[in-house]
Amino acid sequence: MIKIAPSMLAGDFSQMGEQAAMIEKAGADWLHLDVMDGHFVPNITFGAPIIKSIRDKSSLVFDVHLMISEPLRYILDFVKAGADVITFHIESDSPVDETIDLIRSSGCKAALSVKPGTPVESVFPYLDKLDMVLIMTVEPGFGGQKFMADMMPKISALREECEKRSIDIEIQVDGGISAKTIEEPARRGATVFVAGSAVFGADDPAKAIAEMKDIAANCQ
């Protein structure tokens, strides 16, 4: 099932609660929340207290993407803040197995992400323990970047590996996703699409979400 996860990174941080409610009414499935520490990536966004403050404004799945150096230290903070899905990077400094285990034992779904320069095969040893893999189609850290089409073989390789091992997980793509770019990742097996400016910058967010869902669904 296709899911659209608008990224709050493209929204107005001064109205996060209102915008979370708005995109839910517009037909979004998840709310993607990018947490950046200024170390793992150059930018700084927000942390667990902000996420907690908007949790009661929306019933959407809170999809928390930790672009931080030591995710293990902060997992429980984001669990308590109301995260439903917690994604961390294979390139982070935290032990992967221990971090996944803590996320799942705390009642959240666990996901691993790979930067553009990281082989997707790096997550293969952990697939049995994951609910999702996030393939970055831009360099993480800033919104509004151009979609990297050369990341598409990663989606195909991941989907093939999952099918070979009878593993059923979500494949998420994040970066430059819009109605113009969603077709190819959907055709290759992606199921969750993070869209920032394509939703928050649209004159009609509901129309933008519906259009992306329709295009992606027709490619499955």
Short names for language-model regions:
Residues 1-87, 93-95, 102, 110, ...:
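Conserved N-terminal beta1-alpha1 strand-loop-helix module at the mouth
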Residues 113-117:
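Short gly/ser/thr-rich secondary-structure transition/capping motifs
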